[in-house]
From Swiss-Prot:
Presence of the UniProt keyword Cell cycle in the record: no
Name of the protein in question: Circadian clock oscillator protein KaiB
Origin superkingdom: Bacteria
Gene3D superfamilies referenced in this protein's UniProt entry, alphabetically: Glutaredoxin (3.40.30.10)
Assembly information from the UniProt record: The KaiABC complex composition changes during the circadian cycle to control KaiC phosphorylation. Complexes KaiC(6), KaiA(2-4):KaiC(6), KaiB(6):KaiC(6) and KaiC(6):KaiB(6):KaiA(12) are among the most important forms, many form cooperatively. Undergoes a major conformational rearrangment; in the free state forms homotetramers as a dimer of dimers. When bound to the CI domain of KaiC switches to a monomeric thioredoxin-fold (KaiB(fs)). KaiB(fs) binds CikA, leading it to dephosphorylate phospho-RpaA.
Organism field: Microcystis aeruginosa (strain NIES-843 / IAM M-2473)
Family membership noted in the UniProt record: Belongs to the KaiB family.
Free-text comment about domains: Has 2 forms, fold switches to a thioredoxin-like fold (KaiB(fs)) when bound to KaiC.
Pfam families linked to this entry: KaiB
Function of the molecule: Key component of the KaiABC oscillator complex, which constitutes the main circadian regulator in cyanobacteria. Complex composition changes during the circadian cycle to control KaiC phosphorylation. KaiA stimulates KaiC autophosphorylation, while KaiB sequesters KaiA, leading to KaiC autodephosphorylation. Phospho-Ser-431 KaiC accumulation triggers binding of KaiB to form the KaiB(6):KaiC(6) complex, leading to changes in output regulators CikA and SasA. KaiB switches to a thioredoxin-like fold (KaiB(fs)) when bound to KaiC. A metamorphic protein which reversibly switches between an inactive tetrameric fold and a rare, thioredoxin-like monomeric fold (KaiB(fs)). KaiB(fs) binds phospho-KaiC, KaiA and CikA. KaiA and CikA compete for binding to KaiB(fs), and KaiB(fs) and SasA compete for binding to KaiC, thus the clock oscillator and output signal pathway are tightly coupled.
Amino acid sequence: MSVFKKTYVLKLYVAGNTPNSVRALKTLKNILEEEFQGVYALKVIDVLKNPQLAEEDKILATPTLAKVLPPPVRKIIGDLSDREKVLIGLDLLYEEIRERENDS
């Protein structure tokens, strides 16, 4: 019997290679590798190079992290350094993560 695992699709909107952008990406990758290893897809979008994508997704500030799948869409704007706030803000609660680990 195969166990279906959710895949999380995330988009990180940054403005160039600024210290805030680099820090946001590094922090997010750490969270994702520790909590969601193998069950996420992350797309990094530079709004300076792709302003139309930011406009389409109504991104007004950077860094912005958006969880696209599974629904509902959730967004976090600004500092991503607080792991718990990121997980709760994206509706990715610790209990769900731990249940997945126990099912593996």
